[in-house]
C-alpha cells in the first residue's frame, strides 16, 4: 500500500490547525476564569 506523503501532510495540517486553534481558545478561557 503506497503512502501519499502530500496527502498525509495535508490531512495532518487539516486536523492539527483547527485543534491547535481550539486548544488556544480553551486555554485562554480557562485563564480568564481563574
Swiss-Prot record:
Keyword Transferase: no
Taxonomic superkingdom: Eukaryota
SUPFAM superfamilies linked to this entry: Photosystem II reaction center protein M, PsbM
Transmembrane feature ranges: 5-25
Main location: plastid
InterPro entries: PSII_PsbM (IPR007826), PSII_PsbM_sf (IPR037269)
GO cellular component, one term: chloroplast thylakoid membrane
UniProt entry keywords in alphabetical sequence: Chloroplast, Membrane, Photosynthesis, Photosystem II, Plastid, Reaction center, Thylakoid, Transmembrane, Transmembrane helix
One GO process term, biological-process aspect: photosynthesis, light reaction
Compartments (UniProt record): Plastid, Chloroplast thylakoid membrane
Family: Belongs to the PsbM family.
Role, per record: One of the components of the core complex of photosystem II (PSII). PSII is a light-driven water:plastoquinone oxidoreductase that uses light energy to abstract electrons from H(2)O, generating O(2) and a proton gradient subsequently used for ATP formation. It consists of a core antenna complex that captures photons, and an electron transfer chain that converts photonic excitation into a charge separation. This subunit is found at the monomer-monomer interface.
Subunit structure and binding partners: PSII is composed of 1 copy each of membrane proteins PsbA, PsbB, PsbC, PsbD, PsbE, PsbF, PsbH, PsbI, PsbJ, PsbK, PsbL, PsbM, PsbT, PsbX, PsbY, PsbZ, Psb30/Ycf12, at least 3 peripheral proteins of the oxygen-evolving complex and a large number of cofactors. It forms dimeric complexes.
Protein name: Photosystem II reaction center protein M
